[in-house]
Curated annotation (Swiss-Prot):
One Pfam family it belongs to: Ribosomal_L6
Keywords on record: Ribonucleoprotein, Ribosomal protein, RNA-binding, rRNA-binding
GO molecular function terms listed in the Swiss-Prot or TrEMBL record: rRNA binding; structural constituent of ribosome
GO cellular component: cytosolic large ribosomal subunit
The organism's place on the tree of life at top rank: Bacteria
HAMAP family: Ribosomal_uL6_B (MF_01365_B)
Family designation: Belongs to the universal ribosomal protein uL6 family.
PROSITE patterns: RIBOSOMAL_L6_1 (PS00525)
Protein name: Large ribosomal subunit protein uL6
Quaternary structure annotation from Swiss-Prot or TrEMBL: Part of the 50S ribosomal subunit.
Gene3D superfamilies, sorted: Ribosomal protein L6, alpha-beta domain
Gene this protein is translated from: rplF
Function description: This protein binds to the 23S rRNA, and is important in its secondary structure. It is located near the subunit interface in the base of the L7/L12 stalk, and near the tRNA binding site of the peptidyltransferase center.
GO biological process, one term: cytoplasmic translation
Amino acid sequence: MSRIGKKPVQVPAGITASVDGQKVTAKGPKGELFFVANDEIGLKLEDNAIVVTPLSNSKDARSKWGMSRTMIENILKGVKEGYERKLEINGVGYRAALQGKNLQLALGFSHDVVYEPPEGITIAVPKPTEIVVSGINKQQVGQVAAEIREYRGPEPYKGKGVKYAGERIVRKEGKKK
């Protein structure tokens, strides 16, 4: 029995949610998102809450039960509050700047890296060493942050590179003379 899946997802005030077969649509102040559940998952909207149930007792249905509930909860939070991921840049000469909507990164290569964000993602650069990725889709925000970090991930000797805010880098000791 899924402990996460058992709890109904409460629809917050200010959000309209609708269930149409396997599709849950949520509209809120930040935008509109939808989630299509697996055929083995049943969805019902009752008392301003979405109830998720497995239609069979198979292992596959039970494993997708909790995940479906969490995905619905994520789209409801996304259209109400949105998601953001902060990145930090460490290193001499490493910096970020916005060029229109595109992100321009100086990361020690012979050329600047230009990253074009996908539709629905907003990138802000409050300081040259800070990047804030925000949007309503949690998966997409995390994916964009991971792609930016991938250009120059933090290295273990000096900690130079792009890292998530609050990420702890395991440092290594250099060579002994």
